[in-house]
Amino acid sequence: MNNLQVSMNHKKITIDNNIVIDFMEEFPNKLKEFFTLSGNSHVFDREITYLSEKANIIIVISHKIKIYIIFKDYIYLDNTILNSKIVRRFIKKYPILASSYELINPMKLEFKNSNIVWDCLSFTYDAKQAAITLLITTLN
């Protein structure tokens, strides 16, 4: 099933309760074990489910850790990214973030909250691909 969980209290992600990647500990070995390396990107070879949607996950390691969750279903926005069911589910799942977002433009939404461990969470809509991506960043 490959269900993804993203913790807001710890810099960690979990896939199906058995693959735990804690970005505060020695995580490169876990990435090597479960992800395929392509340049400086680590790609999870199987499709995941997050917020009840199919997605792919890519982790890029540089001076920052960037976790890309790329949702697979084609999405056509009527107005802004705030109206998408993915963003609405995200806000419902993490109510602590409900009042800490900024709509940068109709296609980009950022969450910043001192009560979470991640440096930045942002949703971006790519109209050409008709896809939404969640980007989670933290310092390495």
Predicted regions and their residues:
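Short helix/turn-capping signatures at newly exposed starts of structured segments
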Residues: 1-109, 113-117, 126-140
